[in-house]
Design a protein with these regions (language model features):
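Single conserved hydrophobic/aromatic residue that forms the stacking wall/gate
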Residues: 181-190
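Transmitter module of two-component histidine kinases
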Residues: 26, 36, 169-170, 183
Length: 190
């Protein structure tokens, strides 16, 4: 049984590090039985006064993109599998064509292509979010390197259900890799 103090400390931590405001929007993709989803797609947003939109179907890329296009969330909270599936099916195949591989080796063109891919991905996620917070499982290193290479606004939090769930998190602008965490969640649950 997770004590209420653990849930409260996660909610307080979210207030300290996230910048949601009353009226901001979030698409909830994770089940409420998932501690990560409960803490960071419901409890915090509910306490802030955000509008929470629940997906009523299995979160496939098509359903997710339609919801993001309609709602334009201010924050995206997801598990790695969802982000990995989207990138592996919709982005990487386009970049792995023979012509694109050659263009990606040309310095100035490489930067333009990466900027275009980054902008298209931001628009696919609604175009209005500050960052995507990924957590709940390990992140694929190939996908993480790709996101870093295009300067995509994402971060990876680390946690476990027994901690209700967050252990540490870093804002995307300071986040380097999932191996280097710098901001542990404070724990005073007395």
């Amino acid at each position: 049984m997770i004590p209420y103090r653990a849930l409260w400390s996660n909610t307080q931590f979210a207030f300290d590090v996230l910048t949601m405001k009353p009226g901001d929007k979030l698409v909830s993709m994770l089940p409420m039985a998932h501690m990560y989803g409960l803490a960071f797609e419901f409890l915090y947003e509910f306490c802030v006064g955000c509008h929470i939109y629940f997906l009523t179907r299995m979160p496939s890329p098509k359903i997710i993109f339609q919801a993001f296009a309609d709602i334009k969330p201010n924050l995206v909270v997801a598990v790695p599998l969802i982000i990995e599936k989207i990138i592996k099916k919709n982005v990487l195949p386009k970049l792995e064509s023979p012509a694109m591989k050659i263009l990606l080796k040309v310095p100035i063109i490489n930067d333009k292509i990466k900027a275009t891919v980054r902008e298209q991905m931001i628009q696919a996620f609604g175009g209005n979010f500050y960052q995507i917070i990924v957590g709940g499982a390990a992140f694929n290193q190939e996908i993480e390197q790709f996101l870093k290479s295009i300067d995509f606004p994402y971060t990876v939090g680390y946690g476990m259900t027994e901690c209700a769930p967050i252990i540490c998190y870093e804002d995307w602008k300071r986040f380097k890799t999932c191996l280097l965490y710098t901001s542990p969640s404070p724990r005073d649950t007395r």
